[in-house]
A protein has these predicted regions:
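Long, contiguous, compositionally biased segments that the model treats as domain-scale units
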Residues: 1-198
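Short, charged N-terminal helix-start/capping segments
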Residues: 5-21, 29-32, 97, 101-106, ...
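Serine/threonine-rich low-complexity intrinsically disordered regions
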Residues: 14, 29, 41, 64, ...
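A sequence-composition feature that detects small, non-aromatic residues
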Residues: 16, 25, 50, 67, ...
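Residue-identity detector for glycine
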Residues: 39, 55-62, 66, 84, ...
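Short N-terminal signal/transit or membrane-insertion segments
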Residues: 69-76, 80-86, 221-232, 322-337
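Internal, Lys/Arg-enriched amphipathic helical interaction segments that engage polyanionic partners
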Residues: 178-255
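Amphipathic, oligomerization/interface secondary-structure segments
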Residues: 231-448
């Protein structure tokens, strides 16, 4: 039995079966592998239930019958009973919800026709196929729109529910069910970046390969549900003005998608709020997280050349100061102390958090000015004033290391810093400044 991702298993009513089920439930795998349990639903459809091997379990309501229960992170349910048994999938689709916002489905409608009925545009005008090589794997990322409609007996066709945008990942080789978590994470990272919230909504379907008259095609065979996914938290209040659009980014989606999912280069987006409602305020944890994001962008961005030059100059300066200290007649213990201080601060030069924010600001302030000038709710600052707020912001961040967060007004540039991080991510994805400005300018209309 499955209810709200809680799975209850009831063994056969003999002591051996009860003991075997409990022993299985108590097995622990430190690597936290996913184990799949398959069965048949009451309406004769296949279902696959994921269980984490490091997850806990509990006794069912009838302890005397040996029932156990556990929470499943993923449930796969076949669409109908006519489909065959599959041990894996050849593709995965992400449909509707927030994907409708980042890639509006109205592109499928031909608005130039006479208003005598609904006319659809050629699918080639709204379908793009991208070849992606990521983490030593090749697949196709497809951006398109489902423009078919479904008629239900006794009901009027609801086009708003049947015309949906979707992102599809197609694979040449069959993948095990455990891999769908990886592809789900890939798309979620992209949608999180575009919507600027971490709780997103979209439907997920698994695809298999089939053929008609020797012509191979992909078809959906199962629906997938993930524990913790939003059903209505985000999209009922999220609007098209809240998100960055795929059309603005264009073909840059490939490099952006790869950057957001590359283990060595991906940005830190933990500073983004969980939902639109959470945009109304800034939590102290977001200040800590956005500072971590700054560190990553500085480390992986366009700073290395200038930073290397500063390191060389700081080492040279340290050697001169140490030579000067050696020339002074005083106690040796004081000389050693002074040289240790110089050596630790200059020989191993590292810019401060304040320096890193200034660097990102000076690098992307032209784009930031375009965005801030577009919206009345965002303050514009002179360089001198912005530097003052950087001092306040970093002091606010450092206060968490010694006591609770001291809100000193530095949060006034929190959104500005977020925009600078977005510009840095676009640059690291090799997306031109003009495209980055257009994307951010169109996607940050409602910030708080």
């Amino acid at each position: 039995m499955v209810e709200d991702f809680v799975v209850t298993l009831i063994p056969e009513q003999d002591q051996a079966s009860k003991h075997k089920l409990r022993k299985w439930a108590e097995e622990i795998d430190e690597k936290d592998r996913i184990e799949w349990i398959s069965g048949i639903t009451s309406d004769n459809r296949l279902i696959h239930i994921a269980r984490r091997s490091r997850g806990g379990y509990g006794f069912g309501s009838g302890i005397d019958i040996g029932a156990i229960n556990f929470s499943s992170p993923v449930i796969i349910e076949h669409i109908d009973s006519s489909y065959g048994r599959y041990n894996g999938f050849y593709g995965i689709e992400f449909i509707g919800g927030d994907i409708n916002l980042v890639y509006p489905p109205n592109k499928a409608i031909d608005y130039t026709r006479e208003p005598y009925g609904i006319q659809y545009t050629d699918p080639n005008t709204y379908t793009d196929i991208y070849n992606v090589e990521l983490n030593e794997e090749k697949f196709r990322l497809i951006k398109t729109i489902d423009a078919h409609y479904v008629m239900s007996l006794g009901r009027i066709v609801d086009l708003s529910k049947n015309i949906k945008s979707k992102l599809r990942i197609e694979l040449d080789q069959e993948k095990p069910f455990a891999d769908l978590l990886k592809y789900h994470r890939y798309i979620r990272n992209l949608i999180t970046f575009l919507t600027r919230i971490s709780t997103n909504e979209f439907a997920v379907k698994l695809l298999t390969k089939d053929s008609i008259d020797g012509q191979e095609y992909y078809k959906a065979f199962a629906n997938v549900r993930f524990y913790g996914d939003s059903s209505s938290v985000s999209s009922d209040t999220l609007t098209i003005q809240d998100v960055l659009k795929l059309d603005d980014i264009g073909d840059g989606i490939v490099d952006l998608f790869k950057l957001l999912n590359n283990d060595d280069k991906m940005p830190n987006l933990f500073f983004l709020p969980d939902s639109v409602k959470d945009r109304c305020s800034i939590k102290y944890t977001q200040v800590v997280d956005i500072c971590s994001a700054i560190e990553i962008e500085y480390k992986l961005g366009r700073q290395l050349e200038g930073n290397s030059e500063l390191k060389i100059k700081s080492r040279d300066l340290a050697e001169r100061i140490i030579a000067f200290v050696d020339s002074i007649k005083t106690e040796e213990i004081l000389k050693i102390k002074a040289k240790n201080i110089v050596g630790s601060t200059l020989k191993n030069y590292s810019p401060s958090l304040k320096d890193k924010i200034k660097f990102l600001y000076n690098l992307h302030k032209d784009g930031l000015e375009v965005v801030t000038n577009s919206y009345h709710f965002m303050s514009s600052f002179t360089d001198e004033k912005f530097y003052e707020y950087i001092n306040k912001f970093t002091n606010m961040r450092h206060s968490t290391a010694h006591q609770k967060m001291i809100w000193n007004g530095g949060e006034a540039i929190y959104t500005h810093i977020m925009i600078l991080i977005y510009f840095s991510i676009f640059e690291r994805a090799n997306i031109g400044k003009d495209i980055a400005i257009k994307s951010i300018d169109n996607g940050f209309k409602n910030i708080f």
